Amino acid sequence: MSGSISAEDLAASKDVRIIDIRKAPDERHIPGSEKMNGDDLERSSELPFASDERVVLYCGSGNSCSRIAGTLRERGFDVVALEGGYKAWKEAGLPTVLRGI
């Protein structure tokens, strides 16, 4: 994976782990995503995924997830950011689900 992925390419992706790192998420999220603290991911020496696992991070607009994904790539993880974040996903008209569903 390169450093980022478009909303459309993510929607078509298989076998990728999607992580929501928004600090103040609304009640909706990208289907199949899981909520994690981005700052914890960036600082932790032990991560909840393997270095060869394909991971996409998303935040609200793409800024925080780009920075954190870059840090994790430098540490050897296969992590990219969703270009434009959750905002781009919604603007592309892609599905969202209520949290907890």
Model-assigned labels for residue ranges:
Residues 1-17, 21-54, 61-101:
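Rhodanese-like catalytic fold shared by cysteine-dependent sulfurtransferases
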